[in-house]
Design a protein with these regions (language model features):
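ABC family nucleotide-binding domain
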Residues: 5-226
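C-terminal boundary and immediately downstream tail of ABC-type ATPase nucleotide-binding domains
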Residues: 223, 227-248
Length: 248
């Protein structure tokens, strides 16, 4: 809708770790249904940016708005925020002592108030959607890394979030397992899920992103549609980065 506010807006966001200034006056907006991929070298602030959006990392100054409302700092409102903003981590972060099905149903039952029966029905649908429906009774350790990450995506989807954050979701996977996770993410993008994805997967950025954001040293240096960013980056730093990560 023309004139609608972005789902996510970050304005002049700063974050320090001691003397290290990791986010420097960051401004970013994400519209509902948009897929934004954040690229940049290691240590550029990409993961910290991701983690500030659901307050896993509090910011030192600036504003972050979700649905035009500032992020709450604590209590029930923070729990509500985290149910609206899903997150998929590099290391999966599944509950090791709970089955795959329990991992996916826990949040909807405890936070959303679903009945266990409804939550399990929904969980099985989501596990089928990501291709691991036959793993429902297993513990995470019995699954491959790619399967665990697909369960983590199903767990995020089970909360029916407005936005899902992906923090380098394939970087801990063996190379042959990367594509199965990217295929699930590409499917979500095509279905209209709002996604902010920190990744080194250039193919995903090219094919699935509406916009590429390039970061270095805690700053957003450029933003562009992927076809423009990969064909003609405007900053020397982005050109240098692409020359190193893309093999011709």
């Amino acid at each position: 809708m023309v004139g609608a506010s972005p789902l996510l807006r970050m304005e002049r966001v700063n974050k320090w770790f001691g003397d290290l200034h990791v986010l420097k006056d960051v401004g970013l907006s994400v519209d509902a249904g948009e897929v934004v991929v954040v690229l940049g070298p290691s240590g550029s602030g990409k993961s910290t940016l991701c983690r500030t959006i659901n307050r896993l990392e509090p910011i030192d100054s600036g504003t972050i708005l979700l649905d035009s409302r500032p992020l709450p700092s604590e209590g029930r409102e923070l729990a509500r925020l985290r149910s609206d903003v899903g997150m998929v981590f590099q290391q999966f972060n599944l509950f090791a002592h709970k089955s795959v099905l329990e991992n996916v149903t826990l949040g909807p039952v405890r936070v959303r108030g679903l009945s266990r029966r409804d939550a399990e029905t929904r969980a099985r649908e989501l596990l089928a959607r990501v291709g691991v429906e036959d793993q429902a009774s297993k513990l995470p350790a019995q699954l491959s890394g790619g399967q665990q990450q697909r369960v983590a995506i199903a767990r995020a989807l089970a909360m029916e979030p407005k936005l899902i954050l992906f923090d380098e979701p394939t970087s801990a996977l063996d190379p042959e397992m990367v594509q199965e996770v990217l295929d699930v993410m590409t499917g979500l993008a095509r279905e209209g899920m709002t996604m902010l994805v920190v990744t080194h997967e250039m193919g995903f950025a090219r094919s699935a992103a509406n916009r590429v954001v390039f970061m270095d040293h805690g700053q957003i240096l450029e933003q562009a549609p992927p076809e423009d960013f990969f064909a003609s980056p405007t900053t020397g730093r982005a050109k240098d980065f692409l020359s190193k990560v893309i093999r011709h």
